[in-house]
């Protein structure tokens, strides 16, 4: 089964209170956190969408997001991060490592 999913996330302040949303033709999800960042909310929306797809046994999914951070992270940076033990090229920990690992695990199921 093929599935299109639309996600978004935002925060008021960075950090600040934030929320995320997921919309598809078969489900809608939303949530938030009191003290978070825009990027974490963008990623949480995608993470929740992937969790729902796994739960519903949806094998192919196309996720639409306006976040260049997430797009580049998933399509370009994540391969290098994994190879480097979740460290950047400068040797520091990848920001939002916990969410990147969860997203990577789910997208490979």
Residue ranges and their predicted role:
Residues 17-24:
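Acidic, metal-ligating active-site segments
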Residues 4-17, 47-109:
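RNase H catalytic domain
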Residues 1:
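Post-transcriptional modification and biogenesis factors for structured RNAs
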Residues 5, 20, 29:
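A broad, low-specificity signal marking well-ordered, structured residues that form hydrophobic/aromatic
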Residues 25-42:
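A short, polar/acidic, helix/strand-boundary loop motif
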């Amino acid at each position: 089964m093929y599935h299109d999913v639309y996600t978004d996330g935002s925060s008021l302040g960075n950090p600040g209170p934030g929320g995320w949303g997921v919309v598809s033709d078969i489900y809608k999800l939303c949530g938030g956190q009191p003290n978070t960042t825009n990027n974490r909310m963008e990623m949480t929306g995608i993470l929740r969408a992937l969790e729902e797809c796994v739960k519903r046994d949806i094998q192919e999914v196309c996720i639409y997001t306006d976040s260049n951070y997430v797009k580049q992270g998933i399509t370009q940076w994540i391969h290098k991060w994994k190879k480097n033990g979740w460290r950047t090229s400068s040797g520091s920990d990848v920001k939002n490592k916990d969410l990147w690992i969860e997203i990577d695990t789910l997208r490979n199921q």
